[in-house]
Amino acid sequence: IGNTAIQVAVNPLLATIVPGERMTSYLTVGQIFRNTSLLLLAPIVTGLVAATGSWRLLLPIYAGLTVVGGLWLQLTPVPEPAQRERSAGLADCFRLLKNRAVLLSTLGVACFIAADVGIGFLSVRLIDNPSSILTTTGFYACRIVGTLIGAWVLVKVSDVKYLTWNMTGALALCAALLFVRNEAAIYAAVGVLGFAMACVFATFYAVATKAVPENANEVAGLMIMAISAGAVSGPVCGAIVRAWGNPHLGMLFVAACVAYMLWASIQLKMKN
């Protein structure tokens, strides 16, 4: 809950201090740190368990980093816009869904999180090998590379166009993973899929914020609510795997999410 509150607050704050045309690039830079954290989480937890016999020491470390970040932000002067007389409520957030760009982007974030969690769930099951955990590691490692390159590319290329390119490639990779059985090919496909998914959240968030810049706080609330879509991925992918006994068929769910994101990117490009 605390982490979610921080995410809701930080993204609109960023929107007030960066140029609108570069917002996607700046948000992507933030994703670099997030993806690096995800990549390092497993070795950190493993090291803590080996040293102390418990992973719970991770919690005070996380709390300490959060406090340090909060104090740093508190001591940094940030020119915020004047506050409105009335605070935004839940109804104000949902009212923004009447805007087509906001609706497409919110559903896009929901599909992105669902696909992201689905890939994490399936990637270790696509290879019947103790080293299959490396597929998840490779996925997040390639996500880091994707965010690094994306932060540079998005300064020069339209964010929606770049999203369309990536989702076209991602859909082809999802289709390939339905049939590929070679371990090296699976590692490569999952890694490149991670690269293609690197800038999705930043793009949808930036598009929605630029559509209604005066409602940046409400947009942030919608986007964070959309993250809850990740909760359905495990049960749905698990049900598919149990029903057919084939983890590769779970990629159908991921492919459906990616197909929506590709369609949404085309619609947003036409709107722009």
Regions found by a protein language model. Give the residues of each.
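Cytoplasmic helix-loop-helix junction between adjacent transmembrane helices
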Residues: 1-32
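Helix-loop-helix hairpin linking two adjacent transmembrane segments in secondary transporters
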Residues: 21, 26-77
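Interfacial helix-cap and linker-helix signal at transmembrane-aqueous boundaries
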Residues: 44-53, 127-128, 153-154, 237-246
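Multi-pass alpha-helical transporter architecture, strongest
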Residues: 70-77, 252-272
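Juxtamembrane intracellular "pre-TM" segments in multi-pass secondary transporters
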Residues: 80-105
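Extracytoplasmic gate region of multi-pass secondary transporters
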Residues: 99-144
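C-terminal transmembrane helical hairpin of 12-TM major facilitator-type secondary transporters
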Residues: 160-204
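A late C-terminal transmembrane helix in Major Facilitator Superfamily
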Residues: 213-246
